[in-house]
């Protein structure tokens, strides 16, 4: 509905406000009839004189670079010509959504199913570029949070709420006096408020790193994880204060480790890992966090080092990784990216099972390995320590002691034989001490022998695996299992399609519950920080909620857990099963896409494996040679230990 309210620009130009687009606590946003690419923000009450000066400066210094990344004031708006500032005009942000719609796996699967990790990487890069633009102009964002960023399907990012920025107006600072606790850096967590406090670029750089982490790691918070000490995990703000970065290289000391089934930080190259370590630990306060420009450069470089999985075009990851991290997570039941089927990369369409298997069968096994054996060495065993009797002498001593004891008893304790009692006692003491020391020496030598044998056997197994007959047979057995899996895929697909009837109700219900998002739900006692903690554990929708899953999040006791369970139950009560939609074409397509992906994965692995098996014999010498000298030393050590033990 049009308002037809008349307002004036700072130059006295009359404009007409159109329909109201949105309203917040501070003001409302309207279309402008005369400027279709701009909107007007009108405050509920005219801002103070200092805020009016701030807006006037921002409008006067607007340039193309700022307007490209920020919904920056283009002109101040007034109730009358030359009157007080009541609002401002800014670029219209259309065709974009809040950034959590991109980084949240649950939201992205529904709204942006075609967006893979390379898209997220570009979004993260553009977030950094928006910060760099603000900083280059001498300003600070200040109130960094996920609600201040809008992103489009072209990955372009726009910062909104620019009137809250900390603005440097030719030396006059207009402060940003608000903030969101779980985006506030550790060194500012104990501030009672931001009123009168000057923010710095380094404070911004904490929020920037956190946003980039959100985008690249599925919305997870870097300070949310599994507690390793009693006082960790109770409150996100406390964990931030104590630098409990869950993904840190020294996280055991910090008291938090990553949540289960989360994206590993090792997915990133070591230089980018180090940037997060710098941003989220004490060194970021002491020597500065990575700047926005540094993030732009690092992410641009990473974008040039990506590769696609052979199984799915949606699986894009850094080229330094050997295996696809998304496939590994899929196998754990964690789906970050949906493969819609039509984008599966095939193995080229030239896979012929019979041909590949013929390669396997034609592979020649390596010859038996000539390994160093302990028998090849004839070491001299170490003698027993001086004064220590061999076992057979101890036995003779014990026999003699027993015989003398019996003889003494037979002499009916005549006085002249009483002198034998201390002699027998001395013999008994010597024999007892000698026996105890002997047993300790034997135990020590036996343990040394066992360790040497274990080391030798381990090296033998290792050599056999990389270049021996055992390794060749094990690899061929594995390939045979793959071949059998490929042959069984048609039957497996039939069973999966037939099972759709049995699982129809649960699948419909699951899809229904996936439409209820925790981040917009009203759950008693569960505010933004606790919702961030749930998201870090992969709990984003009603479909993700289980009592056990919620209770593993620190801070969710019986009361809060029940509140989340009750919310899920309220969602479930709205579900109505539709039998006529029991099995949709999309359901069938999903099964067939899964089978196709599995076939391509097996075909590719079998092809590579067949080639490796053919080359096994050729490469065996090069693989075993580095291990031969350690094995020779282990064999010699074992022979010595055996000789030492034989002296006992």
Swiss-Prot record:
Autophosphorylated. Dephosphorylated by PphC. Transmembrane segments: none annotated. This is Protein kinase YegI. Its EC number is 2.7.-.-. Residues 15-302 form the Protein kinase domain. Keywords: ATP-binding, Kinase, Nucleotide-binding, Phosphoprotein, Transferase. Probable serine/threonine kinase. The active site is at 143 (proton acceptor). ATP binds at residues 21-29, 41. One of its GO terms (molecular function) is ATP binding. InterPro entries: Kinase-like_dom_sf (IPR011009), Prot_kinase_dom (IPR000719), YegI-like (IPR016960). It comes from the Bacteria. Gene3D superfamilies: Transferase(Phosphotransferase) domain 1.
């Amino acid at each position: 509905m049009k308002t037809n309210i008349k307002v004036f620009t700072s130059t006295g130009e009359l404009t007409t406000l159109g329909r109201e687009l949105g309203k917040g606590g501070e003001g409302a946003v309207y279309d402008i009839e005369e400027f279709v690419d701009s909107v007007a923000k009108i405050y509920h009450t005219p801002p103070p004189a200092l805020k009016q000066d701030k807006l006037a400066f921002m409008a006067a210094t607007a340039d193309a670079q700022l307007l490209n990344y920020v919904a920056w004031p283009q002109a101040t708006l007034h109730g009358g010509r030359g009157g007080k500032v009541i609002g401002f005009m800014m670029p219209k942000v259309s065709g974009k959504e809040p950034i959590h719609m991109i980084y949240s796996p649950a939201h992205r699967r529904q709204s942006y199913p075609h967006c893979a990790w390379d898209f997220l990487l570009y979004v993260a890069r553009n977030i950094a570029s928006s910060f760099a633009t603000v900083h280059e102009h001498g300003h600070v964002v200040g109130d960094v949070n996920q609600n201040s960023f809008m992103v489009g399907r072209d990955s372009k990012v726009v910062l909104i709420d620019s009137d809250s920025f900390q603005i440097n107006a030719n030396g006059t600072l207009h402060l940003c006096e608000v903030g969101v606790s779980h985006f506030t850096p550790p060194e500012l967590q104990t501030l009672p408020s931001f009123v009168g406090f000057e923010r710095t670029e380094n404070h911004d750089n904490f929020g920037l790193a956190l946003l980039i982490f959100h985008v690249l790691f599925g919305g997870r918070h870097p300070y949310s994880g599994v507690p390793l000490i009693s006082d960790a995990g109770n409150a996100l703000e406390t964990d931030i204060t104590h630098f409990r970065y869950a993904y840190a290289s020294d996280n055991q000391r910090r008291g938090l480790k990553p949540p289960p089934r989360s994206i590993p930080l090792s997915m990133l190259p070591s230089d980018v890992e180090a940037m997060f370590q710098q941003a989220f630990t004490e060194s970021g306060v002491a020597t500065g966090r990575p700047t926005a420009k540094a993030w732009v450069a690092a992410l641009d470089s990473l974008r040039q080092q990506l590769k696609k999985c052979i199984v799915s075009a949606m699986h894009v990851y850094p080229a330094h990784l050997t295996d696809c991290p998304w496939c590994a997570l899929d196998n754990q039941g964690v789906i970050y990216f949906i493969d819609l089927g039509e984008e599966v990369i095939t193995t080229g369409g030239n896979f012929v099972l019979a041909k590949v298997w013929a390669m396997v069968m034609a592979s020649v096994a390596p010859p038996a390995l000539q390994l160093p054996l302990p028998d090849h060495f004839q070491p001299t065993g170490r003698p027993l320590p001086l004064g220590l009797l061999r076992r057979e002498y101890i036995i003779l001593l014990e026999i003699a002691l027993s015989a003398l004891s019996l003889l003494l008893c037979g002499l009916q304790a005549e006085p002249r034989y009483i002198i034998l009692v201390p002699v027998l006692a001395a013999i008994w003491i010597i024999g007892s001490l000698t026996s105890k020391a002997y047993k300790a020496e034997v135990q020590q030598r036996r343990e040394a022998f066992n360790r040497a044998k274990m080391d030798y056997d381990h090296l033998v197994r290792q050599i056999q695996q990389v270049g021996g007959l055992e390794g060749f047979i094990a690899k061929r057995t594995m390939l045979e299992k793959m071949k059998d899996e490929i042959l069984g895929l048609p039957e497996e697909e039939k069973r999966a399609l037939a099972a759709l009837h049995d699982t129809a109700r649960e699948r419909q219900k699951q899809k229904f519950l996936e439409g209820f998002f925790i981040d917009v739900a009203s759950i008693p006692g569960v505010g933004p920080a606790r919702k961030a903690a749930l998201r870090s554990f992969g709990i984003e929708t009603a479909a993700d909620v289980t009592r056990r899953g919620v209770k593993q999040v620190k801070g969710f006791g019986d009361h809060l857990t029940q509140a989340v369970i009750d919310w899920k139950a309220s969602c479930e009560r709205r579900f109505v099963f539709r039998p006529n939609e029991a099995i949709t074409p999309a359901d069938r397509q999903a099964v067939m896409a899964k089978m196709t992906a599995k076939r391509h994965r097996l075909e590719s692995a079998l092809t590579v494996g067949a080639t490796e098996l053919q080359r096994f014999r050729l490469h065996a010498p090069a693989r075993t040679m580095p291990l031969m000298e350690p094995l020779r030393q282990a064999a010699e050590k074992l022979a010595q230990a055996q000789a030492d033990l034989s002296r006992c």
